[in-house]
C-alpha cells in the first residue's frame, strides 16, 4: 500500500493481485473462480493436481500475477489443457518481463502465477469472452459495474473503437446492487 499527499490530502493506493482480490471476495461469501498461487513450475503442477481433485477440472488457466491489466494480451494468461502444458506455460511466464499497456515500458517481472480452475472453456470448445469489472467511479465516489459482451482480453480496444458496446451500472451505497440492475446486466450480457 502506498500513501502520498496531493493538495494537502492524504491519498492511499492499494494494489493487490488477482488472487488476493479473489480471497477477499471469497471471505465475504462471493463465489469466485477457484485458483491456487504458485511460485515455480513444480508448485504450479501441484496446484493443478489439487484443483483436479477439488473441482474435477482437467483444463487450467495459468495467470501471471502482476499489478497491471492487459496481462492476457501481453502473453501472461494462457490456457493449459493438461499438466505438461501447466509446466511448460508456467516456465514461460514465471520470470518473464510482462509488458502491457499498463506497465512501464520495460514491463514488470512475473514472480507468481495463479493456476485457476478452467471456468471459461467447458468441454472441448472455447466459449465467448465477456468483460465484467467492479470499480470506483471517482467522480461520484460510488462503485460501478462496467461490462461488455465484447470484452475479455481486448477490452481496451473495445473502449477505444466501439465504446457504445461497454455498459455501466452505478451502485448506490445506501441500497447496494438492486435486482433490476442485476437483471439489466444479465440481459445485456
How does the language model describe each region?
Residues 1-13:
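Short, Lys/Arg-enriched N-terminal segments with co-localized hydrophobic residues
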Residues 30, 36, 58-61, 76-77, ...:
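Structural motif
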Residues 170-189:
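Glycine-rich, mobile lid/loop segments that gate access to catalytic sites or pores
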Residues 33-35, 62-89, 131, 155, ...:
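Glycine-rich phosphate-binding loop of ATP-grasp-fold ATP-dependent ligases
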Residues 13-58, 64:
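A conserved helix-loop-beta module that forms one wall/lid of the active-site cleft
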Residues 52-61, 79-100, 151-153, 163:
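Active-site cofactor/substrate anionic-group-binding motifs, chiefly glycine-
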Residues 18-26, 55-72, 100-123, 132:
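ATP-grasp fold ATP-binding core
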Residues 104-173:
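Hydrophobic alpha-helical hairpins/lids featuring a short glycine-rich hinge
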Amino acid at each position: 500500500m502506498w500513501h502520498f499527499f496531493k493538495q494537502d490530502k492524504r491519498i492511499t493506493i492499494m494494489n493487490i493481485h488477482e488472487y488476493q482480490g479473489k480471497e477477499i471476495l471469497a471471505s465475504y461469501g462471493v463465489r469466485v473462480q477457484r485458483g491456487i498461487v504458485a511460485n515455480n513450475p513444480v508448485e504450479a503442477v501441484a496446484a493443478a493436481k489439487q484443483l483436479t481433485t477439488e473441482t474435477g477440472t482437467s483444463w487450467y488457466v495459468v495467470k501471471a500475477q502482476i499489478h497491471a491489466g492487459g496481462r492476457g494480451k501481453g502473453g501472461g494468461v494462457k490456457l493449459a489443457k493438461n499438466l505438461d502444458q501447466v509446466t511448460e506455460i508456467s516456465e514461460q511466464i514465471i520470470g518473464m518481463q510482462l509488458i502491457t499497456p499498463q506497465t512501464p515500458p520495460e514491463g514488470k517481472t512475473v514472480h507468481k502465477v495463479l493456476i485457476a480452475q478452467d471456468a471459461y472453456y467447458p468441454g472441448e470448445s472455447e466459449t465467448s469472452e465477456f468483460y465484467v469489472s467492479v470499480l470506483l467511479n471517482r467522480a461520484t465516489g460510488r462503485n460501478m459495474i462496467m461490462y461488455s459482451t465484447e470484452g475479455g482480453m481486448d477490452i481496451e480496444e473495445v473502449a477505444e473503437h466501439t465504446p457504445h458496446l461497454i455498459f455501466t451500472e452505478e451502485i448506490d451505497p445506501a441500497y447496494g446492487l438492486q435486482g433490476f440492475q442485476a437483471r439489466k446486466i444479465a440481459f445485456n450480457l
